[in-house]
């Protein structure tokens, strides 16, 4: 690696720590020639291929996942940091599964599973785009599904209290 300021190849790592929200290692480096400091990020290259709806494939891109989740979570109780953390968690799940390919359908289902436990509004917003509801009936069905799961949680909490 070369210094971005003077192009000298002699560098020293002065600090190294995990940047968990980015699935990376953050390193502070110092040039041994000009003594300027800069930061680098070391990331794992995830080589999962995503099969799109039209049948084509592209490399998994975490920023696309973040953008989709952020759009669904806009104006909800979920912060941008939580969106980044959720995307990192999903990326970790992909890496641990050691799969080579995943469809956008599978990614969408994975995102919906996580969103459902975080915020029902974000879940419905994501579902509207991901499932491409054709009419209000399909939207109503999705809302009923999430309401019944919330009621099941409430009932189990009440049973535990009694």
Curated annotation (Swiss-Prot):
Pfam family for this entry, one: Zn_ribbon_NrdR
Zinc finger regions, unnamed = 3-34
Tell me yes or no: is Zinc among this UniProt entry's keywords: yes
Q: Where is the ATP-cone domain?
A: 48-138
The protein's superkingdom reads Bacteria
Q: What does this protein do?
A: Negatively regulates transcription of bacterial ribonucleotide reductase nrd genes and operons by binding to NrdR-boxes.
* Protein name (Swiss-Prot/TrEMBL): Transcriptional repressor NrdR
Question: Which organism encodes this protein?
Answer: Protochlamydia amoebophila (strain UWE25)
């Amino acid at each position: 690696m070369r210094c971005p300021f003077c192009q000298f190849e002699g560098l020293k790592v002065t600090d190294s720590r995990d940047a968990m929200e980015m699935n990376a290692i953050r390193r502070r480096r110092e040039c041994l020639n000009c003594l300027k400091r800069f930061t680098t990020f070391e990331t794992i290259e995830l080589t999962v291929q995503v099969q799109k709806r039209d049948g084509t494939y592209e490399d998994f891109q975490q920023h696309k996942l973040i953008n989709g989740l952020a759009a669904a979570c806009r104006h909800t109780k979920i912060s941008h940091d939580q969106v980044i953390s959720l995307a990192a968690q999903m990326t970790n799940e992909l890496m641990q599964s050691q799969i080579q390919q995943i469809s956008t359908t599978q990614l969408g289902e994975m995102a919906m599973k996580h969103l459902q436990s975080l915020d029902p509004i974000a879940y419905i917003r994501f579902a509207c785009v991901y499932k491409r509801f054709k009419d209000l009936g399909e939207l109503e069905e999705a809302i009923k599904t999430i309401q019944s799961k919330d009621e099941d949680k409430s009932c189990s909490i009440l049973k535990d209290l009694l």
